[in-house]
């Protein structure tokens, strides 16, 4: 009986494994191969990545933007998820719909929308000047500020989903019980709700960080060529300079960083707790 179940399980899993191998493993292996053989066999591309100031600067910019985006997105996502989790169920679906609506727009459309809003004559600068908060338009485009705004706007929904899933799995009787025992609202939150929502924070952090590493369109449009991230340079190396060796080496390093991040999270937080599973 157990052998038949084992055979059935493999029969169901095998097609997925084959598709994964063909569509993911083979291309990744080819990228890894190219990073060692283009333009000449050896570790020359990786040595150049370490020694060339340009590539170190691009890597530093990518990490800096990814970390900043992750921190702000998780903070905002936590606030949004907290409000949704403590809203009556009949209204919760509408708030969740509002969070999911940005997924219906492409990243290109959203980036162009921010270009319109953040330009010197845009709505945001006009509002700041009319309110008397600034005397002249702020430079919100072609710098890291504009790129950060666009990236955070794109990433907040990704942070909300795992956080909300975890919060909805927390027993709603715990905080009122703590309040009944004399704990204040802040103490109840810090001692009970926040620790129980930690798996969601970890899941949201790693999800947003990994996705932020691969941004291409948003920094290209909002950065105006002055904020270059790894994904942009990979695209530039493949389509413009035809420097496949450096491009594939950068892609390999980016993939390695993602794998290491996932491995650390898997070691710190059990998989069944990452998304609020009971």
What is each PLM-predicted segment?
Residues 41-50:
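A short amphipathic helical element positioned immediately N-terminal to and/or at the very start
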Residues 38-40, 216-244, 278:
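Glycine-rich helix-loop "coupling/hinge" segments at transmembrane-helix boundaries
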Residues 7-39, 53-168, 192-216, 221-223, ...:
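Membrane-water interface segments at the C-terminal ends of transmembrane alpha-helices
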Residues 1-6:
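Short, Lys/Arg-rich, polar N-terminal cytosolic tail immediately upstream
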Residues 170-174, 273-274:
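Short glycine/proline-centered loop/turn elements that form peptide/ligand docking sites
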Residues 178:
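The alpha-helix within a helix-turn-helix
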Residues 181-183, 195:
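Glycine/proline-centered hinge or cleavage motifs at structural transition points of membrane proteins
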Residues 268-278:
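Short cytosolic juxtamembrane segments of multi-pass membrane proteins
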């Amino acid at each position: 009986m157990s052998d038949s179940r084992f055979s059935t399980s493999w029969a169901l899993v095998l097609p997925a494994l084959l598709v994964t191998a063909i569509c993911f493993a083979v291309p990744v292996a080819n990228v890894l191969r190219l990073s060692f053989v283009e333009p000449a066999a050896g570790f020359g591309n990786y040595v150049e990545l370490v020694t060339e100031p340009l590539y170190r600067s691009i890597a530093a910019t990518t990490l800096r933007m990814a970390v900043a985006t992750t921190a702000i997105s998780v903070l905002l996502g936590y606030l949004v998820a907290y409000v949704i989790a403590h809203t009556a169920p009949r209204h919760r679906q509408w708030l969740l719909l509002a969070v999911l609506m940005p997924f219906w727009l492409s990243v290109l459309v959203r980036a162009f929308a921010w270009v319109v809003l953040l330009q010197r004559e845009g709505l945001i600068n006009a509002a700041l000047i009319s309110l008397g908060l600034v005397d002249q338009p702020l430079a919100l485009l072609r710098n890291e500020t504009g790129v950060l705004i666009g990236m955070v706007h794109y990433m907040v929904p990704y942070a909300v989903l795992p956080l909300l899933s975890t919060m909805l799995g927390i027993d709603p009787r715990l905080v009122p019980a703590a309040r009944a025992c004399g704990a204040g609202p802040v103490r109840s939150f810090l001692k009970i709700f926040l620790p129980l929502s930690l798996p969601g924070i970890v899941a949201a952090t790693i999800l947003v960080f990994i996705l932020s590493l691969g941004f291409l369109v948003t920094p290209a449009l909002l950065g105006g060529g002055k904020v270059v991230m790894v994904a942009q340079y990979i695209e530039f190396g493949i389509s413009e300079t035809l420097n496949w060796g450096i491009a594939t080496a950068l892609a390999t390093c980016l993939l390695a960083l993602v794998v290491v991040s996932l491995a650390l999270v898997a070691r710190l937080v059990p998989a069944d707790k990452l998304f609020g599973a009971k």
